[in-house]
């Protein structure tokens, strides 16, 4: 049976089956990841001109991810550490999705290639 490409279905499997059952991550990790997607999904829906329920995995591409990270820093005034934590949550999902929907590996790989941001060195 082929796993659906819709983002909401994959996220549901990611949170319920993968994070909780298979990985057995802490409830704090689940909450942090959940909070990331509560911010990211409305942003992605607006950017894609779609409703959240109609988003596809392919909508989560590198260009949209870069715009989201910029939004976190510039409009939400998040620190680099927070930006990187949000990116880590999205990467965890993308790694899961790459196994569940290998047909979308080219899009997923490009999104996974978005780097973390390094903190600026403070000069005395």
Indicate residue ranges for each PLM-predicted region.
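Blade/loop signatures of beta-propeller domains
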Residues: 1-5
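Gly/serine-rich nucleotide phosphate-binding loop at the start of the catalytic core
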Residues: 7-10, 32
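N-terminal core-binding DNA-recognition domain of tyrosine recombinases/integrases
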Residues: 13-28, 34, 38-122
